[in-house]
Curated annotation (Swiss-Prot):
PANTHER family linked: SODIUM_POTASSIUM-TRANSPORTING ATPASE SUBUNIT BETA-1-INTERACTING PROTEIN 3, T-CELL LYMPHOMA BREAKPOINT-ASSOCIATED TARGET 1-RELATED
BP GO annotations: regulation of sodium ion transport
Gene that specifies this protein: nkain3
Single GO cellular component term: plasma membrane
Subunit structure: Interacts with atp1b1 C-terminus.
Pfam families reported in the protein's UniProt record: NKAIN
Highest taxon listed in the record's lineage: Eukaryota
Membrane topology category: Multi-pass membrane protein
InterPro entries, per database record: Na/K-Atpase_Interacting
Keywords of the record: Cell membrane, Membrane, Transmembrane, Transmembrane helix
Entry protein name: Sodium/potassium-transporting ATPase subunit beta-1-interacting protein 3
Similarity field: Belongs to the NKAIN family.
UniProt source species: Xenopus laevis
TM region(s), chain numbering: 5-22, 35-55, 62-82, 151-171
Length: 179
């Protein structure tokens, strides 16, 4: 009943995925990015389900995790395309906020090395409580930080997918041999 290498590795990968998703969730909350917040929340739930299935020898839960990783990879590929403006997508749209606010990625103003300052608004613009800012000196632009986050998610998901398939195979083989 010891922990086999595949199960332990999958538990480690799921734990790492959860930590990375929680980090991403925090920064998406700071930027009011509602679509990624919802996606991250679902991802965290399914990763917990995958962890439970791995620890409790429940292959159906691991299958659900495996199916979700395919959707998660597709979502992160979309985010990469969105921030790199591939295929007619534009990072300047309100798509990530479900078109309910003008917020953007938190990294846009707070990236490494970024210095921002308030810029006076043109008198013709009525901004309410919003203001113009100018961001300069960023070591890495915010869209590339978002792409790096998504690439890490894709890498972890692909590794998790492979190990989940292996663990499902091992668990079902053990069930078949015990009957």
């Amino acid at each position: 009943m010891g922990c086999c290498t595949g199960r332990c590795t999958l538990v480690f990968i799921c734990t790492l995925q959860m930590l990375v998703a929680l980090e991403r969730q925090i920064f998406d909350f700071l930027g009011y990015q509602w679509a990624p917040i919802l996606g991250n929340f679902l991802h965290i739930i399914v990763v917990i389900l995958g962890l439970f299935g791995t620890i409790q020898y429940r292959p159906r839960y691991i299958v659900a995790y495996t199916i979700w990783t395919a959707f998660w990879v597709a979502w992160n590929v979309f985010i990469i395309c969105f921030y790199l403006e591939v295929g007619g997508l534009s990072k300047d749209t309100d798509l990530m906020t479900f078109n309910i606010s003008i917020h953007r990625s938190w990294w846009r103003e707070h990236g490494p090395g970024c210095v921002w300052r308030l810029v006076p608004a043109p008198p013709s613009k009525n901004l309410g409580d919003h203001s113009f800012i100018s961001v300069t000196g960023c070591i890495i632009e915010y869209q590339y930080l978002e792409v790096i986050h998504s690439a890490v998610q894709i890498l972890l998901s692909l590794i998790g997918f492979v190990y989940a398939c292996y663990v499902i195979s091992v668990i079902t083989d053990e069930e078949d041999s015990s009957t």
